[in-house]
Amino acid sequence: MHAIAPRLLLLFVLSGLPGTRGGSGVPGPINPPNSDVVFPGGSPVAQYCYAYPRLDDPGPLGSADAGRQDLPRRVVRHEPLGRSFLTGGLVLLAPPVRGFGAPNATYAARVTYYRLTRACRQPILLRQYGGCRGGEPPSPKTCGSYTYTYQGGGPPTRYALVNASLLVPIWDRAAETFEYQIELGGELHVGLLWVEVGGEGPGPTAPPQAARAEGGPCVPPVPAGRPWRSVPPVWYSAPNPGFRGLRFRERCLPPQTPAAPSDLPRVAFAPQSLLVGITGRTFIRMARPTEDVGVLPPHWAPGALDDGPYAPFPPRPRFRRALRTDPEGVDPDVRAPRTGRRLMALTEDTSSDSPTSAPEKTPLPVSATAMAPSVDPSAEPTAPATTTPPDEMATQAATVAVTPEETAVASPPATASVESSPLPAAAAATPGAGHTNTSSASAAKTPPTTPAPTTPPPTSTHATPRPTTPGPQTTPPGPATPGPVGASAAPTADSPLTASPPATAPGPSAANVSVAATTATPGTRGTARTPPTDPKTHPHGPADAPPGSPAPPPPEHRGGPEEFEGAGDGEPPEDDDSATGLAFRTPNPNKPPPARPGPIRPTLPPGILGPLAPNTPRPPAQAPAKDMPSGPTPQHIPLFWFLTASPALDILFIISTTIHTAAFVCLVALAAQLWRGRAGRRRYAHPSVRYVCLPPERD
């Protein structure tokens, strides 16, 4: 009685520990045992179709044989067997093996499966059985013991061993081929198993024995709750300490070479029933939404599991190959936009009064038809253009077509420089995006003035003007007028004449040419009107436009024949004060000039001005004096040949040597003192005795 009580107490304690069937570590069957799981085609209930943890089988007892075993003398080769299904799910591939040892005898078994691809023969599962009953297939219940299950993929692996068969999840059209090696006593059974989903039947690569299977694979329902929360992952997938190979890489074996436990990178310590549940859980996580709890979906169409957020094992994107060879493989949003050809690059200096311009390396080709002036023979000759005195700023206006989208976009003010632009001044008046319409209404109401008798010489070297010869269809020649509207002939696409670049008057600001854009009604023709040139009423007179003031931005050519439609028809602009602008109003001589709105300063640093200045030269950046090297650093001369690091190492070596020398001297002195004291004690330990003969005493 006293011996039984401790055993009962120990059994009671062990029954409550985590990891046992009756404890709280791993729960029992949560769902009914396969009562709600059926094949989509109406086949019988599958005992392996579940996705929750079960502990129905006894656990493994130890590791498999570490050494690589040789092939037995007798090898039985089976014909390849293939199965094709219409839907996805879990499929049990059973090898065609019938003889399992002699009756009334025991045998040992070794089951190994390989996954075959075009370039690799990868071992995926390995298990050994011992003490199996003859006449029955090896399993955890018919054998006395079995080893851990070694896995070649994962974690966790998507395949599972069911006795001597292979449980495979299928969900895509790609066919999979497996090789099995089952050793039963002294016989080795070898063969191939093939499976696919989708299609009308076995494909061209299927074995001859492949046929359409009845029904279809089973689909496990999603378990309620979180049954795998209490199952440690080390049970069903842990690193194999005896693995000989590279981690996270397939282990490929030569043909007909048996695998050893050292060829598989992972090992599972859980029983077979738990590993089957892991395979079902992996399938529903990869191929089905997790919110469909307890719902058995209908027949899945072929290829329904290929896409979507739950598509299993998507192909690895080949970023390097796409970026190197295939331009279409690169995302167009990531690709940098190609810098187009601009008319000119403009920038503004915040410290100076006059804006500066940077030349563009690639000039814009302007067709001759676009630059040809529009002339109507029936139109009355208008007054010739006039010029301003040499000390005043000479400007030119060209009629261009501006779309409503372009007028709605605001752009920073800039001035087109004739000296820096490689095109003529007339070519600089092409339309562009991002510029407003600056037509003047007051110029259309003012009568023309008397032309000047002389024409000042041009000052531009890049845009040298050519004199215009008066003809029967042209207006009298004249230099560039400083008006905001068409002083020169407006270009049209149907005119055979060519445009002559205007001349610029000499002066302190003769290099700066302000370009104004006006809007004309397409389909009409007329003559260009000349704005007034009186100093008091001229919009760019000395009282209103001082030298160096910013001018309207130059238009930018965008290309396309539709932008030049109706341009240069010579129609007077509408009388609209909103389109006149502040710079084109007649100033009052008795009042100070109106305050001009401050120019919009660029917010980007020089050299990063966006599409307007792709080739803007940067100012030379000078490094601070403290960052500039003063001269070559003298090479360190070590105190000893073995000290080559730094002068600090020399000092540290000297200090350390001094300390150690002093310590050594102290130790030697202490040892000498102790030795001297011990020698003195030894000398006085045995004192010499002398006997002296005393004389006798006298009475």
UniProtKB/Swiss-Prot annotation:
Organism of provenance: Human herpesvirus 2 (strain HG52) (HHV-2)
GO terms for cellular component: membrane; viral envelope; virion membrane
Keyword Membrane among record annotations: yes
Residue ranges crossing the lipid bilayer per the database entry: 651-671
Keyword annotations: Glycoprotein, Membrane, Signal, Transmembrane, Transmembrane helix, Viral envelope protein, Virion
Biased composition (Acidic residues): 562-578
Note: Glycoprotein G is much larger in HSV-2 than in HSV-1.
Intravirion side: 672-699
UniProt membrane topology term: Single-pass type I membrane protein
Region: Disordered, residue numbers: 302-390, 403-632
Extent of Pro residues compositional bias: 448-459, 467-482, 544-554, 589-605
Biased composition (Basic and acidic residues): 323-336
Database matches in Pfam families: Herpes_glycop_D
Superkingdom of origin: Viruses
Residues carrying a glycan: N104, N163, N437, N512
Comp. bias (Low complexity): 376-390, 403-447, 483-531
Name the UniProt record assigns to this protein: Envelope glycoprotein G
Keyword Membrane: yes
